[in-house]
Amino acid sequence: MAQSHSSSVNYFGSVNKVVFEGKASTNPLAFKYYNPQEVIGGKTMKEHLRFSIAYWHTFTADGTDVFGAATMQRPWDHYKGMDLARARVEAAFEMFEKLDAPFFAFHDRDIAPEGSTLKETNQNLDIIVGMIKDYMRDSNVKLLWNTANMFTNPRFVHGAATSCNADVFAYAAAQVKKGLETAKELGAENYVFWGGREGYETLLNTDLKFELDNLARFMHMAVDYAKEIEYTGQFLIEPKPKEPTTHQYDTDAATTIAFLKQYGLDNHFKLNLEANHATLAGHTFEHELRMARVHGLLGSVDANQGHPLLGWDTDEFPTDLYSTTLAMYEILQNGGLGSGGLNFDAKVRRSSFEPDDLVYAHIAGMDAFARGLKVAHKLIEDRVFEDVIQHRYRSFTEGIGLEITEGRANFHTLEQYALNNKTIKNESGRQERLKAILNQYILEV
């Protein structure tokens, strides 16, 4: 039986509380760049970054892949069933405390096992939610978001809200209903929808419009129920182009924004964007962040990175300073993430199987984003790119360009202007110069 909250559980015995020691430190269990109380642009690093630990990769993943068995050595995994669920809560909050992580996130099936019926499943969930609530009461950690796992169980083989089976649609609705109740009880600042099975494998047996309509109906029902129970957290939808489905409906930021606007959901949802999902969609992470930002729909981030040589969702910990800098540049330009945060939807490699590797990995990710924050803030403060962009588009601030932006031009006037204009002169975009400046800031700030 897992020990009670009051007992001295110590799953990470070799790890003390991780503190900031600075870049000269050689201690692998210390922050080199993440100084939670350092003030940058009027806010502390902790306030800017709002780090969150993902329950699924950190406490439930066992290292199984399609070619091999589990490798992870977890001191809580000798328990079974509900005892295992309780032990994971103990391990989670020990790690949250040692990393001083302000937030965490989970799927419903991460924290409690399914029972033989929906009623039994909900009872299991209630027990663990009660335990988590007790631990949260005695700590400073908050729930960034929770969500429903509607992709693992075989009942979701054809999807959840987009299933061809109305019984499955009803089950999914019941599961999200419970998820929203859990969000309210635990004070989740957001609720996430990720439709891993919401898509299709072939159009030969798919009514695409009907499935999209049903998905929208489902989302509206969720909005209505949140209002009914007075849950006020931000709804987030997470794009991904494929895996496990061949074609997922919320392919990328642009596709998801179009869906939200088409079905009148854009006032209720923002986007939870993941770096590895961006690369799977053929985009850079900063592209997805910019696309959401300019539409006013950037809500939260799943912080990770994909392997450039692999074509699937590798969910590596984010250590690429180039990427973290450009991500934080977009987040700062957005005025922050509001109720969102940087959730480490990342897993240690299968060969990094010892418990301490979980801590090393989170330190690496937190330091990488802390460094990215400082560089991005300095880039914005110095107007490195803003001045270049302003100069590049200056032709639209006067003359015919100003007439275009003010709506005073039409095809007739533009044709006349083009006929009279004898010369068109373009200027270099100077991409290489800008990349060199970016490298200089990353190395020197």
From Swiss-Prot:
Mg(2+) 1 binds at residues 238, 274, 302, 345. Its cofactor is Mg(2+). Mg(2+) 2 binds at residues 274, 277, 313, 315. InterPro entries: Xyl_isomerase-like_sf (IPR036237), Xylose_isom_bac (IPR013452), Xylose_isomerase (IPR001998). Its EC number is 5.3.1.5. GO terms for cellular component: cytoplasm. HAMAP family: Xylose_isom_A (MF_00455). This is Xylose isomerase. The gene is xylA.
